[in-house]
A protein has these predicted regions:
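Ribonuclease/tRNase effector modules and their secretory precursors
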Residues: 1-92
Length: 92
């Protein structure tokens, strides 16, 4: 799976959150839950994928661009999200 991103946003995520957009492909290759973000009109389809990076549950926000997933943001899930998604992962 090809992953693209804005280099400046990648650097911000690395500096502020310790997460590298390059690693989003690891998240996408594992078990995930993906939902479309329809809270507003972003001008393009936008998705939120929850998955795992090492032992951390993370959320990757992305949009399809050509044959790639273009990463917009990536962050660790908060406690509320962990509880919700852990239950969903447990259900299979």
């Amino acid at each position: 799976m090809k992953v693209t991103f804005d280099p400046a946003k990648r650097q911000t995520a690395l500096s502020e959150k310790g997460l590298d957009f390059v690693d989003a492909s690891i998240v996408f290759d594992g078990p995930t839950i993906t939902v479309q973000d329809t809270r507003r009109d972003y001008g393009e389809a936008r998705f939120q994928t929850v998955g795992f990076l090492a032992d951390r549950m993370v959320m990757v926000v992305w949009t399809p661009r050509n044959e790639a997933r273009h990463v917009i943001s990536m962050r660790k899930c908060n406690d509320r999200e962990k509880a919700i998604y852990q239950e969903r992962f447990s259900q299979g």
